[in-house]
Amino acid sequence: MSRTFRTFSQSIISPVLTTSLYFIVFGSAIGSRIEDIDGTAYSSFIIPGLIMLTVLSQSISNASFGIFFPKFSGTIYEILSAPISPFEITTGFVSAAATKSVIVGAIILLTSTFFVDLNIRHPIWMFFLLILISITFSLFGFIIGIWANDFQKIQLIPTFIITPLTFLGGSFYSIDMLPEIWQKISYFNPIVYLISAFRWSFYEHSDISIVISLTTIVGFLILCLTAIYFIFKLGYKIKV
């Protein structure tokens, strides 16, 4: 977290400004020409997707770089030799990354109120999902950071997999607007379930059942935890 505040402009101001540009371009300029979606103005409809777009990228990059730098510099062996458990090591890196992502997500949410009138139907669920998704993808980023052995690889999955899946996951449109064949294909995109659940907490309507979406998120969380367990158990890329 201390590194976050030392690089405040890059860590917080930059994603907020970028998202504000999305609001201006897609929300104001283009949104005024698009009909309401499920009774929600387009400028309001895209807010959950824009927040997720930033939260996912922040969670992964924060956690992956957080564990990668100790590996790169060799100081990870000091961490591993310290009298702390793998659970505590993981909790430290992941909680720092997730906290920053939640803060950025909350700031973007606050920023969105300058562009549209928000009436969040389930605020408690909204913050719960924000925290849950931040933790889940911080765990995923932690795994990427351990797997990567250079700076190119650490950007590989976020750039070529996560970002495209997020844009194709219903951030700027409803899955129901797609042709039937593309709707079926979209259900294989895990990001669809995240955005659908998060949008439900805002407007009480979603492309996919909230129960199915929550099950998918928790399932991926468990998968990441299992992977990290075996990483420490086997010493994968963290032990000489």
Would you name each region that the model predicts?
Residues 1-123, 128-240:
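Hydrophobic transmembrane alpha-helices and immediately adjacent juxtamembrane helices
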